[in-house]
Amino acid sequence: MSSDESDAASNKEEDTTLSDDDGSDVEIKNSKKDRKRKLASESEKSGSDDDDDDDDDEDENVTSKKSKKQKRKNKAPSGRDFLAWDVEVDDEDEDDDNDYDDEDDPSMNAMNEREEAERAMKEMELSQRNRDRYKFQNMTEDEVQKYFENKYKGDKNDSQYDDEDSAMDDISKNSHLPSTKDPNLWIVKCRMGEEKLVAMHLMRKCLAVEHTNEPFQIKSVVVKEGLKGMIYIEAFKQSHVMSAIEGFSALNQFTITMVPIKDMVDVLRVVKDIPQLKLGSYVRLKRTMYKDDLAVVDLVDIAQNRVNLKLIPRVDYQKRRGAMRTDADKNYKLKRRPMPKLFDQDTIKEVGGEIVTDGDFLVFEGNHFRRGFLYKYFPINAIQADGVKPTLGELEKFQESSDDLKRELETASLKDTENPFVPGDIVEVKAGELVNLRGKVMTVDGTKVVMMPDQEDLKEAITLNAHELRKYFKEGDHAKVISGRYEGHTGLIVRVKDSTAIVLSDLGMEELKVRVRDLQLCADVTTGVDSLGQFQYHDLVQLDHTGNVGVIVRLEKEHLEVLNMHGVVNRIKPQAIIAKKDVRFAKVLDSQNNSIEAKDLVKVIGGPNAKERETDEDPVGEVLYAFRGTVFVYSRKVTKNGGVLVCKPKQLILQGAKKTTSTPMVSRMASPNPMASPRHSSGGMTPRSPQDGMSSRGSSGGQTPRQGGGGGRGGHFGTANQQKVRRDLTLIGKNVRIIKGPMKGHFGIVRDATEDTVRVELHTQCRTISVDRARVMVVGDTGITAGSGGGSSFYSSSKTPMRDSGKTPMYGSKTPMYGAQTPMYGSMTPAYDGGRTPAYGEGGRTPAYGSKTPAYGDLDEHSSSRTPAYGNDSSRTPAYGSADGARTPAYGSTEGGRTPAYGSMDNSRTPAYDDSGRTPGYESMPSRTPNYDSSSKTPAYPESEHSARTPAYNNDYDIPLSPAYEPDAPEAYDNAPARTPAFVSRTPGYDTYENSSPTYEPDAATKVEEDIGDTSSPTYDSPPHSYVVPTPGAMLNPATPGAYHVDTPGFAAPMTPGSGGAYDQYVAPSPFAGYDSNNYNNADGAIEQIPDHFLAQGVWIVQNLCVQIKDHEGRFNGREAIIKDVTDGKVDVYMPDHKCNLEVDFDQLTPMKPQPGDDARVIFGQDAGHSGQLVSMDGFEAVIRSQEDMSDMRVINIGLCCKMHSET
């Protein structure tokens, strides 16, 4: 029977069945059974035919037949498998039915199967349409209802089978549960941290004895992750466990506990920790670039184990993208995390970034942004949801308005933390009918709070929910922070607004912004000790192994803030601190060489911590520590960094110490004023007077200049050797009383003393303080203080002899006094006769007797007045005879022992010169200093006698000479070195003539003798060497000698300005002939400069200021930048030239000078903060007109202004 005939028969049978009158489901099932029987008969016939065909192949190999069967089983199912009416027949001929395919070709099999499946599907669709068409024609409504009920109601047999399957599953699971026949679990105590190590040792020991006569009887060892101090051992008996752990010191053999059978399953059960995330809750990231950043949960997808977070993006705005990308940008690697900042699409477009829009979102580099925030999916295990407490600063960044922040603070859930209320708290009702009702908490029971109202009409306690209350504080309350970042701090509440409070800390005197619920009324003051009790407030700690130290300025719950030696605050954990430092006995010298140490009171006079305006007071504080040239000072008036200042010793001055008036001996090269005269070792006091307030002890005034004092061999150049502080042993050990200052009235014993300061150990206090010597008096003395220097001087002969009215000082010829006016007619210094300074005459010269330095004369002169005094014997200083070379400087008449040594005709002079180049020189004697060639005389002069003496003089004019000159002086005077002071310049000089041009005439020196009123002034050639000493003070109107401690010329090897070194920028020649444009001030001479320390602090930096970049990458240095934002000590600027953003530090910015028409802002001075438009400039003065008030126009120094970026 063919397949077409069978199909037609089946269709005919189907039509016949559907046309029956009963139309019941039973007949439909019978028709299906008949159809299945026919198909089965057809398959038997085809099977019999196949059997006949297979008789010829009976001799084939059995192995080949089995392999074919296996291949048939592995083939894809045929189309017949998809037919619902196909039934299985008996299994007798199952092996034969598998060989229905003609060939084993896979392609042929697939093609045949596809054709059969398509034909079968067409037949099913046709039959289904026919059944749906005629199914309900002859059925009543009840029959149709019954049909659908039977079709869709549940099958009881199916549910029965499901119950049986579940029961089998339960039985199979229960079979794995431990029973009494299984080994037990035993708990063994273990040393903390060695659980895994012990398990490994047990395994090795078990393997070692496995094949011996006594193997271990334990089955397994279990170590649970996170469970410290115990392990589990599986064994039948406790004795088996004890024998296995014998010899392990890390295990406790005497405490072995068995786990109950019912609890054994829970021991090894692994519970997946899924955080309970809620929409809008705050979380933190554990890893990625956003580690420790705060985020808000936006969507939770538990199925895919991820969560969508809203957070502040970290986008690198400096990286060029797209078409603007260069070869250098291709190798660009992000070295640091970008700053968190809201997404700025304009900046991204400027660097070449491409942004697309997806609804409300902006898509950039695969990330979605909305309203500046980043929305991104993260794995759930990458976030931390427990214990997240955002700070107020972080909450402000996430809130789009102040109302959102207020709402966030007010609706902060109390369920996440413990009940913040305790009995005794003052609370206020924030919601409900009793809003704003205040009272006192009586008891707390879970989330219920019993409050006693403070109203007179309400005398009964009220029970309220905790979330309906909030703590109430008023200004002036003393509170303690019980949670949060500032936990443990105490302070005074200075302001309360909504749910936040401003607390003034007791330790650092700084304002803390905390939430009200984190506060609690407290009468105690914090001890300033951290939670571990290891460090204390204001402790000096070592930060690293390089010697960097710092002072603790803030204590937090888990961190410390340390102010290091460089003035930078580091926030570190206590574990990062190496050790505490003990430098209580360290001492340093302040700017006046006073010794300061811990607990001394000092004043800050320089550096970044000095006063910013002249009207302000200098900061005063107590020395906390002195360490390696760094002093930590605590000032109560400073709130920054807890009042701790980092200063250098030279920026401080000891309070109560007398300022030293003497100028330390420095060389010309180190002089702060290049026009000053060369300095003497005695600071210009030659000889030194006892009325200068200083002891002559240790003084070099009036002594013979030391060997090498001119910078030659043995010279000191003003080093510490000459400034050494000497101790006064006469006062040590005496009882003194403080008569002045803050410690007035205290008694003590002197432990150490110098010329200016004494160290007094107080009797009433266990401390030693430094006191000015003038403020203490020895007990038992009658009103005599322990003045500077204490006892007598070393030498009485070092002072200027005082024996008549012509001496200085003395009445009659004192300076100033009548007849000694300065200036007076003729520019005399002082007036003629006995008022000259220093006066000359008998014994009145400076130094006395012949005005020689060192003074000497003939053998019959008074030897006691010489400085130093000497006679004709070896007591001279240094002693010398008339012909030996021991003079100071030693020289003979013709030898080269002079200083500088030279011969009479050679070029070894300093500097070398010929006979006509002495300065100031006359005649042809070979001992003038300094000297150089004739073309550069200072001042120039002819070789006539008395023509170029310094100062110039003539017997015909009553012009005083300094030092005094006598025509009949010994010849040694005329042969002495060059005289001082200068040529023609009277002291103090004034000229009645108006013309003072610094021109030079060759016979200028001669004209002085002929006409003292000559107005010509000499000019000078540049010295041939930088160490040539010029004639001091020419045309500079020098002051009265001695008033400014004028040193002996030539001493300490003065350096000619302009020859390099420290004063290379001062190009004025010497002698000075007028100001040059490149001198001390700028060209305009009046532009005010902003201190560098003020610029480095960054307090002047505001948005839209135009600045210049320095100390950065080469392509950015010197470029203009516009300030966009200031965050966490960093400045975010925009570079118009590079069209990119840049992050810099405060000290990398300098303000730009505005031009007329620019917007400007005053950043320093009394008008700081004033802004407007720069209307005009007149030199250094700028006229700035305020944009708010057009009538407000101010004239401000241009050096105090900075250009502002204009939006228009």
UniProtKB/Swiss-Prot annotation:
The keyword Repeat applies. Residues 1-116, 151-176, 658-726, 792-812, 836-1004 are annotated as: Disordered. It is found in: Nucleus. Phosphorylated. Phosphorylation by P-TEFb alleviates transcriptional pausing. Gene3D superfamilies: 2.30.30.30, NusG, N-terminal domain. May function as a component of the DRB sensitivity-inducing factor complex (DSIF complex), which regulates transcription elongation by RNA polymerase II. DSIF may enhance transcriptional pausing at sites proximal to the promoter, which may in turn facilitate the assembly of an elongation competent RNA polymerase II complex. This is Transcription elongation factor SPT5. It comes from Caenorhabditis elegans.
